[in-house]
Structures are given as C-alpha cells and as structure tokens.
Amino acid sequence: MSAKPIKSILFVCLGNICRSPLAEGVLRAVLTEGGEDRDFVIDSAGTGGWHAGEQPDRRSIAVAAKHGVDISGQRARKVLPEDFPRFDLILGMDEANVRDLKALAPAARDRIHLYLDFATGNVTDVPDPYYDGTEAFASVYRMIRDASEALAKRLDASPSTLDSDQASSTI
C-alpha cells in the first residue's frame, strides 16, 4: 500500500452545475474556516458537457450564498483526459458518475471514489436536485457540508498523505 500526497481534488457530477460546484465551493469554505493553510487545487467538472461555460444552477448559487459560500464565479466544464493524472483524488457524486469516470480512465481507478463513501464511509449517492425544488438543493447542501467537514478532518488527520486503501468504495 503506497501513500499518495493529496494536494488536488476534483469533484464530479453529471452536468457540473448543481452538486459538484457546491462540493468545490463548500470544501474550499470548510478548509478556510478551519485555518487550513495548505495549498490545495480544488476543482469540479461534469461527465457531460451540456452546460460547459455556464454558471452553476441558480438554486445551487442561492443555497451556497445562504450559507456564506460564493460559487457564482465557477463555470461548468466537462471532465478532460488530462484531469485524471492531474488530480490526486477524484470524487463522484453518485455511483453512475463513478462508473463513468472509471470507464474513462481505468488506470486512475484507485483515485476515483464515491464522495460520501470516501468522506464519511456512508455508501450513498448525493442525489441530483436538478429536477426538484429548493428543499432538495438545501438537503444536498447539508449532505455536502457534512461530507466536506468529514473530508477536511480526514485530510487534516493525515496532512501530507492519504492511503488509497482507506476508502471503502468498491464501485
């Protein structure tokens, strides 16, 4: 088992306008609130490119802003082949995202995980709130906030390395 330094994290959902931009923004906020001074590269992308160049969904922007997190400057993009060697940790929001990512980059399988499973040990998807109302976005925000706090603690517990075997994801 070899330990890899975790210096870059990519969050991935389907369109990169709801869940993954929230995860990117919330983890940044959690690390800042915790006085985390390590330099991280945190980004987000989608497995699909339908929304490339667009801002996050207005409901994601609103729920983040309600909690003091500004994600309005983010722009959607599709996962690129060069993302796989660039990021130490790639976290999919649901099992379909994880399957798609592993199919795109089989060599990166050990760095691709289901977000909630990796962060909290809870093998659960972050549901896509796109076709739902504001309460669904609020619920997704809470899930992402809790997972981001757990992930920050996990990163802090092992400040320079994280064993890939620590994740229980078997997807």
What are these regions (language model features)?
Residues 20, 94-95:
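Helix N-cap/beta->alpha junction signal
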Residues 13, 64, 91-92, 144:
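Hydrophobic structural packing positions in well-ordered secondary structure
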Residues 2-86, 153-163, 171:
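Conserved active-site segments centered on acidic
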Residues 89, 95-171:
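Phosphate-binding/catalytic loops
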